[in-house]
Amino acid sequence: MNKFYANERSVLILLALLKAHNIKRVIASPGTTNLSLVASLQSDPFFEMYSCVDERSAAYMACGIAAETGEPVVITCTGATASRNYPSGLTEAYYRKLQILAITGTQDETKIGHLHAQVIDRSVIPNDVVRYSTHIRATYTDEDAYYTELKINQAINELFRHGGGPVHINLHTLYIRDFHVNSLPAVRAIHCLDYTKIDSFPKLPKGRIGVFVGSHATFTPELTMAVDNFCSAHDAVCFCDNTSGYYGKYRMNYALLGSQEKAEYTNINVLDLCIHIGEISADYATLGNMVRKNVWRVSEDGEIRDQFKKLTYVFEMSEIDFFKYYTPDEFDLKRDYLMECQKLDEAIRARLPEIPFSNVWIASQLYDKLPSGSEIHFGVLNSIRSWNLFNLPRDVHSFANVGGFGIDGGVSSMLGASFINHNRLYFGVFGDLAFFYDMNSIGNRHVGSNVRIMVINNGRGQEFRNHYHTGSIFGKDADKYIAAGGHFGNMSKTLLKDYAENLGFTYISASDKEEFKNVYATFVNPNLTDSPILFECFTDTDDEANALKAYWNADKDIKNTIINKVIEVSGGKQALRNVLGPRGIKFFRTILNKRT
C-alpha cells in the first residue's frame, strides 16, 4: 500500500518533534481517535513499534522498556475507557521516574459532557500519575501550529526535567482518511539543559550576539563582571531598559532606537543569537524592533519561556555560571557592536525635536539630575515608557511593577523600598490613574522624608489616547469609558495639594515648562529634607501624545526640518521646483532619505 503520513498538522508536528528529540519506541493499542497517529508512525521506519491490545499491559510494558533502555517510550490509545487503563502503569512510572509519553486520542473537547459516544473528560488527572498533561487541539492556522509545537516541546522536555517521569498528551484528531503526505514539516525543537548535561551544551553560533534583559533584580558585582567579560569576549551587547538591573560596561538602552517608526537601519537590530535573561520587559520598542534568529533562555527555573517564538535552548542554571562557561579564559577586548549601537543612538538624540510639556519632556529634563545613589520607581505604562527613552545615571537604580503589569500598586512598592534605607532618596513617577489608585499608601505612618513622588496628571489614562493605541481612534470620546477621564477631581489644582499637605508632604506643582523650571530643583535636591515631597505636574493629553510621537519619529523629524527650511528660503514649494528641476528634486529626496 502506498500510504504515508496523515494529512493532519497536529499529527505531523508531533511526529516531527518525536524524531527531533530522538524518541523512537512506541507501543500502540488499537482505536480510531489515535488511528491517524498510529498509521503515520507505522509508515516511518524511524519508529520501533510494538502492539498491545490491553492498555494496562501496554503501560506496564512501557515501564519495562524504559527501565531496560533508559530511554523514553510512547504509548498511545483511543478515547473512552481505553485511556482509563493507563493510570496504574503510569503511577508505577511516576514513582520510578520512568520516561513514558502517553498519547491519548480524543474527539473535539466541545463534545465532553453532551452524551457523545466514546467521549470522556481527561482534563483532570491525579497528581501522581503524570508530571505534566496537555491538550493539543486540531491545528489549522500558523498560530495554531506554533502553539501545538510549543506545547509538545514542553511535554517532551518534562519527560527528562528534574529526574523525569511520565507525561500525557491528549491529542484531538479528525478521523482523516488522507494518508498521502510524504514528508514531515520543519519544526523547532526546544531542548532544556542543566548542569547534568553540560557535555551537551551547544556552541555559540557565529554572528552577532545580544543579551536581552527583562525585569531583573539588581545585578551583583560578580554577575556584572561575568556579563561584561562575556560581551567583551564575543563583541556582544546587553540590551536593557530601566527595569533590567544591569549597569555594566556593555549596557545599551535601545528604547529610543527601537521606537523609531520610520527608521531604516542596516542590520544593527538583527541578532544571530539572543540570550534572554530576566523576566517581563516594559521595553515594547526593543521587544518589537529586534530580529532574533535564535534565542537561548537562561533561568534557574528551567521553564520554557518562548517570548520571541525563536527559542531553541533553555539553560536551567545560574546566569553567572552560564556566562562564565561561555567565556574563554583569555580574550581580546571587543566593543565594535556596542560602539555601533551607541553611535546610532547618539545620532538620533542629536535630532530630538522640541516637544511640549509632557511626561517625556519632564523625563528629558530630570533623567540626568537624579541624585547619585538614589532609586526611582515608575508607574506603568506611560511613565516607564517615557523614561525608558533616556539613560539614567549608572548609580541610580530603577524599578517598575512589570510582573503583573498593573497600575494598582506602584506607589506602595516604592514606599516599601523606602522603608529599608532611610538615608537613600526614593523617587517615583506615576500617572494620575496609577497614583490615585494607590493614594491611600502615602498616608502610611512609616513614610519618611526620603520619599519624592511625582504625579503626571492629565486627567485620564494617557495610554488610550496615544496615536498607536486603538482607543485613540475615538478621540475625546475615549475619555468617557475607555480612558476613564474626569475622575479624581478632574485635574483639580487643590485636591492632591490639600491631601498631601495634610499628610505632612511638601507640595509643589507645575502646569508648564516655566513653572517646572522654577521648582524642579526642590524635587531633585540631593539632600534629605524635613518632609517627603509630592510634585504634581499638570499636562495636556494631546501634548502627551504629540510629544511621544515626535520622539518616535525623531529620525524623520530632521528630514522634515531640512525640507521646511529649504522651502522657506526658496520662496515656496513651486519656487524650489523651478530652481531644482525634476532631476534636482529627485537627487534632493535621495540625500534626505539616507540614514546614519
Where are these regions (language model features)?
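Phosphate/pyrophosphate-binding active-site segments
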Residues: 1-5, 285, 289-382, 499, ...
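N-terminal cofactor/phosphate-binding cores enriched in small/glycine residues
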Residues: 6-91
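Active-site diphosphate/adenylate-binding microenvironment
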Residues: 11-22, 29-33, 37-42, 342-423
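Structural signature of the thiamine diphosphate
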Residues: 25, 68-77, 83, 93-97, ...
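Alpha-helix C-terminal capping segments
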Residues: 40-44, 61-72, 87-102, 233, ...
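Glycine-rich, anion-gripping cofactor-binding loops and their flanking helix/strand elements
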Residues: 85, 213-296, 304, 393-423, ...
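Thiamine diphosphate
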Residues: 103, 110-123, 129, 389-596
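Glycine-rich, acidic loop regions that bind phosphate or pyrophosphate groups
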Residues: 104-152, 240-343, 445-446, 468
